Curated annotation (Swiss-Prot):
SUPFAM superfamilies: Mechanosensitive channel protein MscS (YggB), C-terminal domain, Mechanosensitive channel protein MscS (YggB), transmembrane region, Sm-like ribonucleoproteins. This is Uncharacterized MscS family protein BUsg_437. The chain crosses the membrane at residues 24-44, 64-84, 96-116. It holds the Pfam family MS_channel_3rd. It is found in: Cell membrane. The lineage of its organism: Bacteria, Pseudomonadati, Pseudomonadota, Gammaproteobacteria, Enterobacterales. Keywords: Cell membrane, Membrane, Transmembrane, Transmembrane helix. It comes from Buchnera aphidicola subsp. Schizaphis graminum (strain Sg).
């Protein structure tokens, strides 16, 4: 009896396979196609990811950001490939896309600040308003750029402090880059007493500037009387030098100005106030 049942089951299975062979063949084709799509998509994702990473590295973009962006590109391609594979075997991809969209929206709301920093980081490495090694002013902090990371940028101030600034704060504010241009202008203010010969002062200051080799002679040099102050005549000097030597030129010229003024007996006055006393008549 048991043997008869087994034979009947085999016959039923064989008949079912014969009746549904076309359907089964279609399933096999679709499943094979889905596997091929998935494998091909993963292979293409790897190639594109490596290509994007290589391009970003070639453009001197931070390795951390380049790796993150290339990995993000890879996962996006794999996700779309997976959806296409599921659709090939008959899964309703509309619901899958809706679920992924809802999940993405929820994650986006939860990580709103972080995503803002990430987007700002992408803009920083793409637009490149600042680069590693440049000295910048970001409004409330100034320093040399050490690293531009995915979510934040690190600066080192002149007194050696390490400051971490969120990227969205940088991209939404003003960026003053002191290192981008090869030349910058120095400005000096020199005060002398009122009894000093103005022409002599200009002559002395001009001689100091002309004897300084690091001052660019092909750029505008301004020396003039800028203010009649209460206690002094104030002169302004403007000259250009290379960005790398800007501070050194400033300190050296200040010393040379003082020495030359002393040699020519030109005094730098102290602030003074004239006090007039009147004797009150008792009558």
């Amino acid at each position: 009896m048991n043997e008869l049942n087994v034979v009947n089951d085999i016959n039923h299975a064989g008949n079912w396979l014969i009746r549904n062979q076309e359907l089964l063949f279609g399933y096999v084709i679709n499943l094979t196609s889905a596997i091929i799509i998935l494998i091909s998509g993963m292979f293409i994702a790897k190639i594109i990811s490596n290509g994007v990473n290589q391009i970003l590295i070639t453009r001197h973009i931070d390795a951390t950001i380049a790796g993150f962006l290339s990995a993000l590109m890879r996962y996006i391609i794999i996700t779309f490939t997976l959806i296409a594979s599921l659709g090939r075997i008959g899964v309703q991809t509309t619901s899958v896309i809706a679920i992924l969209g809802a999940a993405g929206m929820a994650i986006g709301l939860a990580l709103q600040g972080s995503l803002s920093n990430f987007a700002a980081g992408v803009l920083l490495v793409t637009l490149r308003p600042l680069k590693t090694g440049e000295y910048v002013n970001l409004g409330n902090v100034a320093g040399t750029v050490l690293n531009i990371h995915i979510f934040y940028t690190t600066l080192r101030t002149l007194d050696g402090k390490i400051v971490v600034v969120p990227n969205n704060k940088i991209i939404s504010g003003n960026i003053i880059n002191y290192s981008r241009e090869p030349a910058r202008r120095n400005e000096f203010s020199i005060s002398v007493s009122y009894n000093t010969d103005i022409d002599l002062v200009i002559k002395v200051l001009k001689r100091v500037i002309e004897n300084e080799d690091r001052v660019m002679k092909d750029r505008d040099i301004v020396i003039g009387l800028s203010e009649l102050a209460p206690s002094s005549l104030n002169f302004i000097i403007r000259c250009w030098s290379s960005t790398d030597e800007l501070n050194a030129v400033y300190w050296d010229l200040m010393v040379k100005f003082k020495k030359e003024l002393d040699k020519n007996n030109i005094n730098i006055p102290y602030p003074q106030i004239d006090v007039h006393l009147y004797k009150k008549n008792k009558n």
